[in-house]
UniProtKB/Swiss-Prot annotation:
The active site is at residues 103, 175. This is Triosephosphate isomerase. One of its GO terms (cellular component) is cytosol. It comes from Shewanella amazonensis (strain ATCC BAA-1098 / SB2B). Involved in the gluconeogenesis. Catalyzes stereospecifically the conversion of dihydroxyacetone phosphate (DHAP) to D-glyceraldehyde-3-phosphate (G3P). Homodimer.
Amino acid sequence: MALRRPMVAGNWKMNGSAALAQELFKKFAVKLQNDSAEVVLCPPTIYLESVRQLLEANKEALNGCLVRMGAQNLSQHDFGAYTGEISGQMLKDSGCRYVIVGHSERRRMYGETSDIVAEKFAAAQKHGLTPILCVGESGPAREARRTFEVIAEELDVVIEKNGTMAFDNAIIAYEPLWAVGTGKSATPEQAQEVHAFIRRRLSEVSPFIGENVRILYGGSVTPSNAADLFAQPDVDGGLIGGASLNSTEFLTLCSIAMSA
């Protein structure tokens, strides 16, 4: 069985501040005791430099603990007249290691199709970033028992453009749309069922990728439900929204992941 290092990725969305970053790093130095889990901070773009400086300044205090930086989005284009966009190379230059692609809010609010998501996935890897690919079904799709169908479609578009082996350098995040920002989380059994399906889907083409790819759960993860979610055999941590804005809650989630 593969040894997949758990990950806790905090997606601040359009929230947070430089002060929150400072508060988190003060607690990281005390609370993070080992490298058994990887912690990723995905602040708004304007705060990437603040987080980068804090990573550098606290390198010794972190004592080998794996704290990384990620972005919430990138353009599928390398450069050009795309006002307000940011390229993969720019994110790489800023110190990012990861970037979220295909988040449900971007798909829903900004019309990002699966084809665009596949292009962004490719752009991330082209510039040395590891994409965190989000997939998930809506409430009506779940009620219609179309969960696997929807997720297979979202995965297959990315696979068709990039190949299965591209997932050797990628993270997948299952985020049921009916749980994102609603306070209603999938049960551990529901999460495990979907994560196992994703792993099987990839294993059909590459058993190595299926066994080794990390799959996070995202959707109203809190300190009260994280232990049961993270204990599932195919759940490798969480993509955290609201709880990532509370330093105490976020550190608790990191500790749970480290002991999962």
